[in-house]
Amino acid sequence: MRARGAGCPAGLLAVGWLILVGLQASQASNVTSSGGGVQEPAVAREGESESESESEEEAENEGEVPESETTAEADAEEEVQNRTIVKEVEFGMCTVTCGVGIREVILTNGCPGGESKCVVRVEECRGPVDCGWGKPISENLDSARLSCVHISPENRFKYVWKLLKPDQQPVILTNDSAVLEITREIRPLAFECDTLDNNEMVASVKFTVYTTNELQMRRSSRPDTDAVLVFVLTIGVIICIFVIFVLIFIIINWAAVKSFWGSKTSATEIQSELSSMRYKDSTSLDQSPTDIPVHEDDALSEWNE
């Protein structure tokens, strides 16, 4: 009885142990199954995101083709517009014959207000570098002001002033501004100004600064053209005004003028007729005397018969 009683608890323990092992195994299988269930939606979501990204990439690739086409079309349109603009643009005359100046860019088509031409902008233009000999912008008996060739803005260019000496190298002055003021000395001086743009010479002009005595002599020896010009202009204006008044008088009194000229022409015609008649009478009276003896001879011959 004791052996059976001892065997029963051992069997119960074995059965309990097996049950616990089975429960642990079942729990482990549930965990693995639940993990697989969680992983499957994640994999599905990853697949969906990959498919969405692929569709977006395809859409982008499809959208890139028309963008390139549109850019090519836009470039072609810009080229055509540029060509038409070149054909429709004219350039005005440059404001200078040498050095650097400005000119107008004129549009001949597409102007606002239906105008045939309009100024689009103003741009820089350049002529020959050598401008020869210039004149001071202002001078008096004591000094003279010289100016280099430039346009606005003045500080855009670099200016190099030189003192010219015969048979010697020119002396570069320290002044680097566009205007140079010189005091007259006992001998005439010659200066040169070079205008540089990015170390490239765009203009060069020379000046002569005379002495005070030379300046006075030049002013005194200069013909008084101003007075002559004023006199000629005054006489011309007076003559023009007189002619205008005469024309106005003739237009207003055209009938009287016409009758006056008609009577005058008739009087001249009468005088011409009288003179022609007098000429005829004088020619008839001035016949040759040989005509009369001929008639007398005829009469005598008839009487003798």
From Swiss-Prot:
Residues 29-81, 281-305 are annotated as: Disordered. Its main location: membrane. Residues 49-79 have a biased composition (Acidic residues). The modification Phosphoserine is found at residues 266, 288, 301. The keyword Glycoprotein applies. The chain crosses the membrane at residues 232-252. Disulfide bonds: none annotated. Keywords: Cytoplasmic vesicle, Glycoprotein, Membrane, Phosphoprotein, Signal, Transmembrane, Transmembrane helix. One of its GO terms (cellular component) is inner acrosomal membrane. Residues 253-305 are cytoplasmic. It is a single-pass type I membrane protein. Testis specific (at protein level). One of its GO terms (biological process) is spermatogenesis. Glycans are attached at residue 30. Residues 1-28 form the signal peptide. N-glycosylated. Residues 29-231 are extracellular. Disruption phenotype: Males are sterile, while female fertility is not affected. Spermatozoa have significantly impaired swimming ability. The sperm head has a rounded shape instead of the normal hook-shaped morphology. The acrosome membrane does not associate normally with the nuclear envelope or intermediate filament bundles, and fails to expand along the nuclear surface. The sperm nucleus remains globular and mitochondria appear disorganized. It is found in: Cytoplasmic vesicle, Secretory vesicle, Acrosome inner membrane. The modification Phosphotyrosine is found at residue 279. Plays a role in acrosome expansion and establishment of normal sperm morphology during spermatogenesis. Important for male fertility. Interacts with CYLC1; the interaction may be relevant for proper acrosome attachment to the nuclear envelope. PANTHER family: SPERM ACROSOME MEMBRANE-ASSOCIATED PROTEIN 1. This is Sperm acrosome membrane-associated protein 1.
